[in-house]
Amino acid sequence: MNASIPAITTGPLPASSKVHVQGTLHDIKVPMRQIEISDECPLNVYDSSGPYTDTAISIDIAKGLADSRGIWLRSRGDVEEYDGRTITAVDNGFAEGERLTPAFPNQRRPLRAVGDRAVTQMAYARAGIITPEMEFVAIRENIGRTQALKEERDGEDFGASIPDFVTPEFVRQEIASGRAIIPANINHRELEPMIIGRNFLVKINANIGNSAVTSSMEEEVEKMVWSIRWGADTVMDLSTGRNIHNIRDWIIRNAPVPIGTVPLYQALEKVGGIAEDLTWEIFRDTLIEQAEQGVDYFTIHAGVRLHMIPLTARRVTGIVSRGGSIMAKWCLHHHRESFLYEHFEEICDICRRYDVSFSLGDGLRPGSIADANDAAQFAELETLGELTKIAWAKDCQVMIEGPGHVPMHKIKTNMDKQLEHCHEAPFYTLGPLTTDIAPGYDHITSAIGAAMIGWFGTAMLCYVTPKEHLGLPDRNDVKTGVITYKLAAHAADLAKGHPGAQMRDDALSRARFEFRWEDQFNLGLDPDTARAMHDETLPKQAHKVSHFCSMCGPKFCSMKISHDIRAAAEKQDGMEQMAEKFREGGQLYVPVTEPAE
């Protein structure tokens, strides 16, 4: 493989620049995207794109991003550097020679907790400590809220406790209670912290990853950068096949967002893909390997219990989770509970030393709407609630994964049961897909369900691309999935009544009514596509100031007609006001004329 540095997408989005807000409790600078608008003040929006859209920063992925958190971590006095485990051929799927992806060149010694301490954000929050990470996310969540204080709250939040203004203390309380998490491994020092919780903005995750048959390090790093450019808040690396360790290292060292994994996938590669040969020792070693690299959250399918597996026998689509099917096969072969369930407390002990958050996997999620809300799904959910309490007792951060395929009328039940059984831990759902009849369009079938469940209280939505059920998504699929899910998340924020959420909508609506085409493009989630579509029929620069588009033309544009009506009404109103003055004066108004010279 060519070890040269791959080309990475950089540069700001149209009419945009990076601005920073200074912290008050800690020496931090929180990045935001500022969009210039003609004849209006600039609009600041939440920005997860990291330094890649900052013209003041030079990107070299062979060096990785800046170590922005190192000083925060060391100042707490509870971490230590150590040599870490030795990387072996098995960690990269026995890739060798030209097939071996080069190791990331700028290696650091990993950090871990001193002694038996917990270095998690939950542990600090419970101790009453407001960390830099907590203040960082509070500032991010407050974008637009100061202006929104002037407006009346509008929305239905289904019992959430969304504040008018997010303070660092509010963040601390939410973390301490388990209602929110900040995925922030102490070895992911390049991270720009973000928060996942019901009382905060709805977040989205993008999945990337190579497979045994396709993709490379270059593609995966670019897919990560590409996905956060368009708004992904976290990225999951679901790589299988060769080079898993090295590809993951390149991704994390260049990722400003949290990175999640399913460690079971790599553990399975280490035993040649034979599920029955998996052991606790192999899995434990894989957890430590990934924790040392800086993985921020692990999907752990510990809720798949032996007695639940027969409940899936009558399903239309059986067990569709890769992790769930692997553990079900292991349990049946050994006729015992999974090592994930039996050793869950030991998994917690590993996670608390690095602050790796749990994403408790829904291994028995429904893979078709026919299987939605069945006994297997909800039996596992109850177990996930039990595991949540065990993790919380160890000061570990937890979120709960959810379905899947669920028709619209059954979605609310999923949210209600999750809140009940999992004690308000953040919910993280894949969609859900609301119908099964649209291969190639499952980004749409799932966005319908995602918007609904986000409104009901889900904290993070895992994107679905047009390639779902069909193949590995490419760069364009990733963008389509991210944009679609940003729409769903934003729609949920609006419906919940998040203060400030509507400011961007209103700014774009004003631009639309005033025929400010460039502002319309730039304020949208995807300026490039909006501009390209307009250019298809009206490509000239003069068309960018026209008071019509190709849909209606100049004579039938409803907004142009509205302008004419408004102008006529204002003229008529002016005449009426003048007539009223005449009536009040009781005489006609006679203008004064200058005397003739």
UniProtKB/Swiss-Prot annotation:
One of its GO terms (biological process) is thiamine diphosphate biosynthetic process. Zn(2+) binds at residues 405, 469. It holds the Pfam family ThiC_Rad_SAM. GO terms for cellular component: cytosol. InterPro entries: ThiC, ThiC-associated_dom, ThiC/Bza_core_dom, ThiC/BzaA/B. [4Fe-4S] cluster binds at residues 549, 552, 557. Substrate binds at residues 207, 236, 265, 301, 321-323, 362-365, 401, 428. Binds 1 [4Fe-4S] cluster per subunit. The cluster is coordinated with 3 cysteines and an exchangeable S-adenosyl-L-methionine. Pathway: Cofactor biosynthesis; thiamine diphosphate biosynthesis. Its cofactor is [4Fe-4S] cluster. Disulfide bonds: none annotated. It catalyses: 5-amino-1-(5-phospho-beta-D-ribosyl)imidazole + S-adenosyl-L-methionine = 4-amino-2-methyl-5-(phosphooxymethyl)pyrimidine + CO + 5'-deoxyadenosine + formate + L-methionine + 3 H(+). GO terms for molecular function: 4 iron, 4 sulfur cluster binding; carbon-carbon lyase activity; zinc ion binding. Gene3D superfamilies: 6.10.250.620, Radical SAM ThiC family, central domain (3.20.20.540). Keywords: 4Fe-4S, Iron, Iron-sulfur, Lyase, Metal-binding, S-adenosyl-L-methionine, Thiamine biosynthesis, Zinc. Its EC number is 4.1.99.17. Homodimer. Catalyzes the synthesis of the hydroxymethylpyrimidine phosphate (HMP-P) moiety of thiamine from aminoimidazole ribotide (AIR) in a radical S-adenosyl-L-methionine (SAM)-dependent reaction. Belongs to the ThiC family. HAMAP family: ThiC. This is Phosphomethylpyrimidine synthase. It comes from Gluconobacter oxydans (strain 621H) (Gluconobacter suboxydans).
